Design a protein with these regions (language model features):
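Gram-negative outer-membrane beta-barrel transporters
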Residues: 1-55, 145-147
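Extracellular loop and loop/strand-boundary signature of outer-membrane beta-barrel proteins
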Residues: 10-16, 62-68, 127-132
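A contiguous binding-surface segment within folded domains or other stable secondary-structure elements
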Residues: 49-67
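Residues that define the transmembrane beta-barrel architecture of outer-membrane proteins
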Residues: 21-25, 72-76, 136-140
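C-terminal beta-signal and adjacent terminal beta-strands/loops
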Residues: 45-55, 82-148
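Surface-exposed coil/turn segments at beta-strand junctions on protein surfaces, enriched
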Residues: 20, 32-34, 71, 86, ...
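Active-site lining segments that contact anionic ligands and/or coordinate catalytic metals
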Residues: 34-38, 73-77, 88-92, 139
């Protein structure tokens, strides 16, 4: 309970940094059907991480009901490019889609205190609360590039 110690949290060797996943994984593959084309796919995954405010990893959500970890997640991205070198020297067209599967995920979180209740009414006393930072939704774009 950090409030019992004037907000101080005792962190020891071996404790994990908040919002930094213990494990991460990235896999990229590229397919080139011919010299002008390339198609790529990337999968990026992160394990769960502890929220800020739980630096000593002692906040147990099973005891107080307050979420103490940011869940792990995975995202799939696709990209493609066509090089017009045979007809328009230096010009390329490209397309990208990030978060192809439109996963709902969180990139970070914080345990803090608030004076706003779940129903958005004001509270006379501070209430422990957890907030999460949402990840980017699916997005896509197309572009034209000239390289010289």
């Amino acid at each position: 309970n950090s409030s019992a110690d004037d907000g101080a949290i005792q962190v020891e060797d071996g404790d994990y940094l908040p919002n930094i996943p213990k494990h991460s994984f990235k896999l990229r593959t590229v397919y080139k059907p011919d010299p002008a084309w390339y198609l790529g796919a990337t999968v990026t995954a992160f394990s769960s991480s502890y929220m800020m405010g739980n630096e000593n990893q002692e906040n147990d959500s099973s005891v107080n009901g307050l979420q103490s970890e940011v869940p792990g997640y995975a995202v799939v991205n696709l990209d493609a490019e066509y090089n017009f070198s045979s007809t328009l020297e230096g010009w390329k067209i490209y397309a990208k889609v990030s978060n192809l599967l439109d996963n709902k995920y969180y990139t970070g979180g914080r345990i803090a205190e608030s004076r706003v209740n779940a129903d958005r009414s004001f509270s006379e006393e501070e209430i422990a609360t957890a907030s999460l930072v949402g990840g980017a939704p699916r997005a896509g774009w197309v572009g034209l590039r000239y390289e010289f």
